[in-house]
Amino acid sequence: MKPEEFKQNVKDRVRVFEDGGIRLLKKGKRGIIRAIFGRTGLVLALFFVQVLLLLSVFRWFTALVPHLLGGSIAFTAVMVIYLLNSDMDNSAKITWLVVIALVPVLGVVLFWWTKGEVGHRMLKRRLKQLAQDTQEQLPQDAQTLERLKAQESGAASLAYYLRGKGGGFPVYENTAVTYFPSGEAKFAELLRQLEKAKQYIFLEYFIIDEGLMWGRVLEVLARKAAEGVHVRVMYDGTCEFTTLPRDYPKRLERLGITCKVFSPLMPFVSTHYNYRDHRKVLVIDGKVGFTGGVNLADEYINHVEKFGRWKDAAVMLEGEAVRSLTAIFLQMWDIAREPEFEAYLKQPIPAPAEAKGFAAPYGDCPLDGERVGELVYIDLLNRARKYIHIMTPYLILDGELETALKFAAERGVDVHLILPGKPDKRIPYALAKTHYAALIRSGVKISEWVPGFVHAKVFVVDDREAVVGTINLDYRSLYHHFEDAVWMVDAPCIPAIEDDFQRTLTQCRAVEATKQSIWQGQTLLRLTGRLVKAIAPLL
């Protein structure tokens, strides 16, 4: 169906714009104001009422503490001993010890409330079963693993982990990987690939916001749905508070698009809301897949400016490795239904002519006890010999990752991080800077991108390995979010990733291990970072 013909057919259901895109929302019917005065506002109001009621109960209970002081002290002492002997990250232990010391009763209750998995036990069991199903449906080709082992034994060990406890994701050959150094570059290719869809299109994104980017994508999706292509869209429930109305899935369904919202906002206090779907996955016919840092909103393609220029990165896969991206999408889509792996993962995928090297897309689930994203990063740091170059928007490190960064630099590896010169959030920006001095003194190089905000999540190592995905260097990504990434070995695109790092570096300010260089006279920011660092794992 031609675009002009399609727009004529749906003009009574959408607004058509000169940029070629379509919109479902009227101007002004979005954002924080809409959320406050709409159904989402009611949900939040009920949520805060519950919080106030819980705090009232805590206050009443705390009033009894003087009468039960001996028991309270003993209970707190038991909690301290429990924390010190737990397998929790040391930074998280310190945080909880601080909280319990400041508010003993409330702190203990909060700890057990979060540890008790209130609201997501069933989800945890379901995801565990889906992970087992994924491993059965994605067999590892033994010859591929042997060839990887012959080229790089350390990389083969990482592949073994990803195939096993890392979620059941194999390493593939017969896959071409294209690297995009900006959201604009990804957007242009994404539109071209969407036009080729014949069977299905799967989209899973953390953020969707109406504007030029989503409008152009939505026009193609709706047109393809009218042609009989099966289109599925899934986005994180936080969009209901920030960008989209609660009835947006129904609006998409009127265009023939099936839509789900991950963890929508509900008026119940639960730790379940702490786990967000931060993934950015697009799969077309099981043959082409995209992932990376780029969401479907205009700031990601610099059509609007929020924090100066926006620097991002993404990759496109063509070939066998797309199977894993398809599985990652289906894991989330099929949480409440029978999995559809058989229907979508058994189709033959032709190998692109230019396919070389190895690729392993993988997901990270915060509920399986495996910190896959962090362990992959640490493994790359430990195996680096010449250099490891990193782009990340945030730097809120636990002890293990900070030690790995320092140790790599102390071994003589060129460890270089590029972070934003203009932050999107002040508190994470302040927390990042609290790590600078210790890292720099160990030999780690840190640079800040002067033109604006770096949102890319990129590791490139020794001209041989790279990771591009959604996983930030902060607690939320490493512990609390559903994430995904692609690990590559000897892929032809790896020199392009390193070239992008070097080009970005030319617009950066080198940071030195001095108070003036790190904080640039921002005393309030420095105090904020020092104060908040004690509770960083909770942010």
Regions found by a protein language model. Name each.
Residues 391-392, 449, 468-469:
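Thr-Gly-centered strand-to-loop micro-motif
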Residues 457:
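Catalytic-core elements of nucleic-acid end-processing and repair enzymes
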Residues 403, 429-433:
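Short glycine/threonine-rich loop-to-helix capping motif typified by GTGT followed
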Residues 1-375, 379, 383, 423, ...:
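N-terminal localization/anchoring segments of enzymes in phospholipid and broader phosphate metabolism
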Residues 394-416, 420, 425:
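Helical hairpin unit composed of two closely spaced alpha helices linked by a short loop
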